[in-house]
Amino acid sequence: MVKFTKKDKRKNKKLMPERNENYMNNIKKLCGFCINEWHLTTMILPYISKEIENNYKMITILENSIEENIKTLIKKLNLKNEEDILEINWKQSVAQKYTEVGSKLNIIAKSDEKYIILVNGRKNFIDVVNKHIDKWLKKNTKVKQEIKIINCYEITDFNYNI
């Protein structure tokens, strides 16, 4: 018979580091799928417009730029917050190193505003970015505002690894 205990027999040794009791309660992870950049643009634009009206700020980490698609679609739509949407960086992001992702996320730590982090690309790209985001969140446990992380996978390979 095996007995599982939480007690550590070494003196003054904590099993888990102390954290803010609200740690990760303010983080929501969402998932979506798109076929290409145009599909992403038409899918995400109404959602982003609504969330900007709800006082969310936006950070994008994109494998491919969708800036031209956003500009083209905004010209054809009548949105209240066109300027706010165009101010978002819709260009391709370099996200292979933690410092590249961390520098984008440091804006959150300096602010009290709610944020949406949009991550778009193929599975490998999103996996790397999410590791960097998780590492950043563990280092910045004092961040208390609401953060939504939207992972939007680009489905270019149709296989069972999704």
In which residue ranges do the predicted regions lie?
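Non-catalytic regulatory/interaction regions at protein termini and inter-domain linkers
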Residues: V2-I162
